[in-house]
């Protein structure tokens, strides 16, 4: 057989394989060997696992599994589960869409409040140390900027979400202490929106930080709804 014939046979097999791949993608509920899988009957997995259902009269708290999803959101999740996509494409497009809806500079979908705090802290460290956005956050913090200013009354159970990034907390209590706490190593100021304690208001916290050119992270994860509070988190 000629080399040309061999190449044609090879390309023909490749084309057939790609056609089969495309056909398989068009049938998302078929398994790997092309057998149609039966539709699963609804299962109450909380009952199956022996978990007691609760009435959430508190708010959108992580320990209460956040908030119930509306039927439209459940339908969107079910639809999205039918097709694979590149995760980076999804993150970028979803973030841009949410930013437009929320009228803010940028947005990112995270796995929850703790991961949001970690990612925001990592972003502030990366920017403060002059690392390009395309590079990973520094893992060796020796000699790098890593200080996060926080009110002592705002230290809470999610401190570890920031500590995971290798930061060092600088605790303050009064406005005077806060104004004097900034150094060349300050990368972020943290504010816990749900904390009633603390001598420094959110408005003063943001004002002083921005006067020093330092970004603020406001954990307001459990403070929406009402939707009118959304802008308070973008500082």
Where are these regions (language model features)?
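N-terminal export signals
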Residues: 1-32
């Amino acid at each position: 057989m000629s080399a040309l014939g061999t190449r044609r046979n090879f390309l023909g097999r490749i084309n057939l394989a790609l056609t089969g791949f495309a056909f398989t993608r068009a049938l998302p509920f078929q398994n790997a060997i092309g057998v149609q899988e039966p539709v699963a009957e609804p299962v109450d997995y909380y009952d199956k696992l022996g978990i007691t259902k609760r009435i959430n009269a508190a708010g959108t708290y992580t320990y209460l599994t956040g908030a119930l999803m509306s039927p439209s959101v459940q339908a969107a999740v079910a639809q999205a589960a039918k097709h694979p996509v590149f995760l980076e494409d999804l993150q970028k497009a979803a973030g841009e869409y949410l930013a437009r809806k929320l009228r803010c500079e940028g947005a990112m979908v995270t796995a929850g409040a703790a991961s949001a705090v970690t990612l925001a802290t990592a972003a502030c460290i990366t920017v403060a140390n002059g690392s390009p956005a395309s590079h990973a956050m520094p893992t060796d913090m020796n000699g790098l900027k890593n200080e996060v200013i926080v009110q002592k009354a705002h230290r809470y159970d999610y401190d570890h979400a920031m500590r995971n990034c290798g930061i060092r907390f600088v605790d303050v209590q009064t406005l005077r202490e806060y104004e004097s706490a900034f150094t060349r190593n300050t990368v972020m100021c943290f504010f816990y929106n749900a904390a009633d304690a603390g001598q420094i208001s959110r408005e003063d916290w943001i004002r002083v930080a921005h006067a020093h050119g330092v970004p603020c992270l406001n954990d307001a994860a459990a403070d929406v709804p009402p939707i009118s509070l959304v802008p308070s988190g973008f500082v």
